[in-house]
């Protein structure tokens, strides 16, 4: 019999385990052989000891003793404090009595007062004693609670120690039993031999491995148990991580301006840019990391990702500057602003010259208006301001910027020439701006004049005369003889009365820039038409991207003026730079703030220009529609003949559906002009050229404004491409690239090749095997291929820019001096939506 007893930290075990082992040998016969088998019988009994009962009694006794000691201590402290308070009160009373005896006998009234004071002092002392007693009781109660809490903690510690001792005891008992079993197995293996010995050794080896694994596991458990008890418990917990990862993303306040890139938005939300792009893809918007998105899209993305959005107004300074202006609320009648428009050489400037009684037309190059002239005249005590425009560029710019500077359009049509292309363009501009038209039929003094034909032709363009039941006034005039000029002025004044034109006269002025240029001696000069208020010399003017103080003002006759009221045009000096035609001019208070606003506008201009370049692209039409920016596809159609124009416009209108509409903004016959390009830029339109080309001035505007210009020679290709764009299925594009242009200087006759054109290559390279077109006055008259290309009697494959050559066009002999031969090649371009 063995007894396993373990004492840990001096504590007696609560139980005793008694083990008894009996070994016997049994003889058996198997297969005719006698075999001895050893049998071992183990018995175990656990007997509880008196140690547990004694420990429990000791714990209860310690708890009672601690409670008694704490109560006695609290009681003694309270009694001591009360005794000290009473002694202090007694001493104070004795001192008062001694002082009272030293003082001479007072009068009866004084004695009554002293008695009253003594009664009050006695009451105060009684209250003080009561307060001291309450404090002593409170202290005693707190001390008792602390003693009770201390006893409970002591009890918990004792229980923990007992449980630890019990665990250590059992762990150690297991090890002791395992060690004893191992020793017994080793003895058995030493006494055995042969196969049984080998078999038992193998079995014992497996048992050794299992027991070894068990011992290692128990050893780890024992080590962990020791680390978690006693003083080392806090150290073990201190080694653990003291924080956890947040379960959700932190919501932030995201400040968003008018525009922001995807990368900047991700940085403000403290997330990866890929997460922002994923969110945008889920919302149906495709974007790259450097793409600029608008404020509304950025707000939706940030709110979708759980952040709070703060909208920042970047133009807050501009709004504050514009709002800080004193404008008198009193409205007065103002003079009408009249724009003279019409075809070239129909007499616009001559008519205006006769009205002003000044010979200005002779001073202009070739009699053609080189710049905008702004003048005001008085008739019958009433004033009229006239604008004479070349090409209507400023008028279109004003309309594009929303500045309605013109009140009435006087459309000048020559009676002997009729309605011409620029006349139609002028009508389109006036209707787009919503301005009434007064038609002046000029040159009626000529023998071939036919004013009735002009009225009939204008009916086709929805300009209906009053005698036909319309609302458009027709006046027959002669700018040369002055016939009908007074009637024209009366018609203008009558139209202005119908419009009831009013403006604020007093206050800070606003206006629009009619024209501007850079003078070598005076610097930037801007002609400003005042619309409201009065412009004074010395005012601070904010004008588009420029600003400055008005140093001098001059009227149309070159005389200095101190102020200018509504509808008065003046030349202004003192701006920081040359503003653009159509910019709004505003008088502000602070020059420093005006400079800040001008710099802010300059910074925003680049972003607006980049955004505008993408809007008019045919490939991006559906993207813009998805964003809600484009509800219809604006188109300008120019063709070589009127029949093609009518057929294309009718076919495009038939393509319109309920979702996508094709709107023909303008159409006409002839080459693409500067006016077409300006109208396309203002109305965000695509220019379609059918057998026509754009001239140099139009190409400059198209390149600077990034207008989408497309050339076609087959109407079905034009319609199919527009149809493919509308259906969203853009096929691979075969684009015609012009690689060379040759100008015909002379024509020679050859017996074999027919007409040979002696040409000078003006642009690019002329190649022999490429297709060509013959242009006359920018209109395609033949399309084919070259039959021969020679230079100094030698056949060559190509001729470069600046060289002369002889060109023979196959199956075409009607080449004339001044024609242009255009060489192009067909290039396949893959489209992306």
UniProtKB/Swiss-Prot annotation:
Chief location: cytoplasm
Bias (Basic and acidic residues): 53-99, 110-152, 204-227
Tagged with keyword Zinc: no
Transmembrane segments: none
GO CC field: cytosol
One of the Pfam families matching this protein, by short name: GTP_EFTU
G2: annotated segments: 367-371
Full protein name: Translation initiation factor IF-2
Residues bound to GTP: 342-349, 388-392, 442-445
Gene label: infB
Residue ranges, annotated region (G4): 442-445
Region (G1) location: 342-349
